[in-house]
């Protein structure tokens, strides 16, 4: 029990996504490997190694927005979805669920940035038949994510309807 609590606390304090090299298409040198994590990062925190054969996250640049995780086709980059999934699941009885980005100040269940909303989270809400409302703040001036976070999340939602 204590170990689980300590892991949850350490997860909250760590803005860096977990990286699992064996899943990474670049690390595996798979044909058509993906550099989507690198090209989507608004803070230039995802660094590709020589010849694009490795991926590193610069802890000084990473804000934890989650956009790299959202676009990773192999799941090599990830955050723990359990708190967000549990929140959506717990809100089912009210007929809908909401998640807000923390900088919005909207209150209620939050994530650091809506960039952390992944296809798995959208799919889970759909599978539970829970309408999911996402609340963002002033994205163009936010130091965590990027100005186009709402458009990216909307596109993600359309792809999983």
Model-derived features: positions:
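Iron-sulfur cluster-binding cysteine motifs and their immediate structural context
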Residues: 32-57, 67-84
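Well-ordered, non-membrane alpha-helical segments in soluble/globular domains
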Residues: 118, 147-156
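Conserved small/polar residues in nucleotide/adenosyl-binding loops
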Residues: 159-161
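Extended interfacial segments that mediate partner engagement and assembly in macromolecular machines
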Residues: 74-78, 89-122
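PEST-like low-complexity intrinsically disordered regions enriched in Ser/Thr/Pro and acidic residues
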Residues: 112-114, 138-145
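Glycine-rich phosphate/pyrophosphate-binding loops
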Residues: 127-142
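Ferredoxin-type iron-sulfur electron-transfer modules and their immediate structural context
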Residues: 1-40, 44, 94-103
């Amino acid at each position: 029990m204590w170990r689980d609590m300590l892991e949850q606390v350490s997860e909250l304090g760590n803005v860096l996504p977990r990286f699992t090299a064996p899943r990474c298409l670049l690390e595996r040198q798979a044909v058509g490997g993906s550099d989507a994590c690198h090209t989507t990062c608004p803070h230039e925190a995802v660094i590709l190694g020589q010849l694009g054969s490795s991926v590193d996250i610069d802890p000084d640049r990473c804000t934890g927005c989650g956009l790299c995780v959202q676009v990773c086709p192999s799941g090599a980059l990830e955050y723990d979805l359990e708190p967000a999934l549990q929140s959506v699941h717990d809100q089912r009885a009210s007929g809908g669920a909401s998640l807000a980005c923390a900088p919005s100040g909207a209150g209620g269940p939050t994530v650091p940035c809506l960039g952390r909303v992944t296809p798995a989270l959208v799919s889970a809400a759909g599978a539970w038949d829970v309408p999911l409302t996402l609340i963002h703040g002033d994205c163009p001036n936010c130091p965590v994510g990027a100005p186009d976070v709402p458009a990216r999340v909307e596109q993600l939602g359309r792809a999983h309807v």
